[in-house]
Amino acid sequence: MVGFFQTLHRLTRHLAGAPTEVKMTEIAALPASVLPPGIRSRFVSDVNGLRMHILEAGFEARSEKNTARPLVLLLHGFPELAYSWRKVMLPLAAAGYHVIAPDQRGYGRTTGWDGDYDGDVASFRMLNLVRDVMSLISALGYRSVDGVFGHDAGSHVAAWCSLIRPDVFRSVAMMSAPFAGSPPLPFNTDSEGPAKPPASNIHEDLAALKRPRKHYQWYYSTRPANDNMWKCAQGVHAFMRAYYHHKSADWKQNQPFPLKSWTAGELEKMPTYYIMDLNEGMAETVAKEMPSASAIAANKWLPDSEMAVYAEEYGRNGYQGGLQWYRCNTSGANSAELQLFSGRTIDVPSCFIAGKSDWGIYQRPGGDMIKMQKDAVTNMLGCHLVDGAGHWVQQEQP
């Protein structure tokens, strides 16, 4: 089985129902004591209005020669951090790359973003997230990137970077979230008329099931979602532990398979972290799957000392920054802007990586994996499903 690092190297050659505001204040870098030796934490100012926190490896001293080293960017998803790449940064640096993993807009120690539910959601749209990445590259003194790698929601940022600016992003690795392509513009409506609306409302259909359900992405777009997780009864550390366990290969019920259609009867086959019980929040959903104390003590890929880093960051900020990304998707705002690129494809060398136990591959029935390989990406070097990994592939099986 091809390992995660080998694949990358080969490719590159306070109240429920009310928003809790996050105050954006400058914060110190991550202490060296929580980072593997050789990974450094620092800030880059004036990145599209952000003071961006990055983790960095393979760039020991500043000089004009440093920018000649090939740059690799690692983009995390939700609920993750730059820290999520800690296990692969040093191998990439040893292979000769300047490796940068930022806390993206809405996350971690990066500041300058609006954490209010009623605030500036537009700044979290995909085109502005790509602008964030472009601005970071420019601030670092680079004009191109040898490889941009994204996981989960970061997979889509990486995909759009490479589609919009292939002159800058020379290769791309998409992880856990397949890229189905640019949203289409309505076609031939002059002759055929507008497309017919869906015969039914998927959210009403899910709620009408014998076991009433709801889709997690639309739940994440609601006002109560942030405080449900941030102010949960079990505390942020326990919530994150249960959430990460539930979506990992350690949860043995993660046995994903393709779904036939975008219907309630098919969607309800997915685990509750994707198709939730209607009257529960995410905190209650994952609490049922909290691993035992002995299982936590035996966990090698995410020991409690590392989970504490996530708990500190999300305990300070909450989750609204990352949830704004979901709102831009479910509202249609992203799709409306990205239709500008209708028909365009990713043409740079590409690959896809996911865990074999990751439902993220199949969460959108209709074949996002197939669309990615057949239509959206023209230079796909390979799709790798990694044994022993669920959703957190670069952490579970680096």
Regions found by a protein language model. Give the residues of each.
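Structural cue for short, hydrophobic secondary-structure segments
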Residues: 68, 74-77, 101
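Conserved alpha/beta-hydrolase
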Residues: 91-114
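An N-terminal hydrophobic leader/cap segment in hydrolases
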Residues: 2-43
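Catalytic histidine-centered segment of alpha/beta-hydrolase-like enzymes
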Residues: 389-398
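Flexible "cap/lid" subdomain of the alpha/beta-hydrolase fold that forms the substrate-access gate
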Residues: 25-41, 52, 60-63, 69-71, ...
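Serine-hydrolase catalytic-loop signature spanning alpha/beta hydrolases and amidase-signature enzymes
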Residues: 79-87, 99
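Short glycine-rich catalytic loops that host catalytic nucleophiles or stabilize transition states
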Residues: 382-389
